[in-house]
Swiss-Prot record:
<keyword id="KW-0963">Cytoplasm</keyword>
<dbReference type="InterPro" id="IPR050181">
    <property type="entry name" value="Cold_shock_domain"/>
</dbReference>
<dbReference type="InterPro" id="IPR012340">
    <property type="entry name" value="NA-bd_OB-fold"/>
</dbReference>
<dbReference type="GO" id="GO:0003677">
    <property type="term" value="F:DNA binding"/>
</dbReference>
<keyword id="KW-0805">Transcription regulation</keyword>
<feature type="domain" description="CSD">
    <location>
        <begin position="7"/>
        <end position="67"/>
    </location>
</feature>
<dbReference type="GO" id="GO:0010468">
    <property type="term" value="P:regulation of gene expression"/>
</dbReference>
<dbReference type="InterPro" id="IPR019844">
    <property type="entry name" value="CSD_CS"/>
</dbReference>
<dbReference type="InterPro" id="IPR011129">
    <property type="entry name" value="CSD"/>
</dbReference>
<dbReference type="GO" id="GO:0005829">
    <property type="term" value="C:cytosol"/>
</dbReference>
<protein>
    <recommendedName>
        <fullName>Cold shock-like protein CspB</fullName>
    </recommendedName>
</protein>
<keyword id="KW-0238">DNA-binding</keyword>
<dbReference type="GO" id="GO:0003676">
    <property type="term" value="F:nucleic acid binding"/>
</dbReference>
<keyword id="KW-0010">Activator</keyword>
<dbReference type="Pfam" id="PF00313">
    <property type="entry name" value="CSD"/>
</dbReference>
<keyword id="KW-0804">Transcription</keyword>
<dbReference type="InterPro" id="IPR002059">
    <property type="entry name" value="CSP_DNA-bd"/>
</dbReference>
């Protein structure tokens, strides 16, 4: 599943390097790891930030990939 989606960052713990995104379509919150964030800056997200992402099935369930801040 590589369809691009948008959503809001529900929360992100920069110290632990992960958080969750609430998809705009109302589907279940999606796990996001800092390594999935695109960009050259410090890879973190802010609560309430708009993002675009795709979903892939990981070992522990669906996770966001190719996350881009909007």
């Amino acid at each position: 599943m590589s369809n691009k989606m948008t959503g809001l960052v529900k929360w992100f713990d920069a110290g632990k390097g992960f958080g969750f995104i609430s998809p705009a379509d109302g589907s279940k919150d999606v796990f996001v790891h800092f390594s999935a964030i695109q960009g050259n800056d410090y890879k973190t997200l802010d609560e309430g930030q708009n993002v675009e992402f795709s979903i892939e099935q990981g070992q522990k369930g669906p996770s966001a990939v190719n996350v881009v801040a909007l």
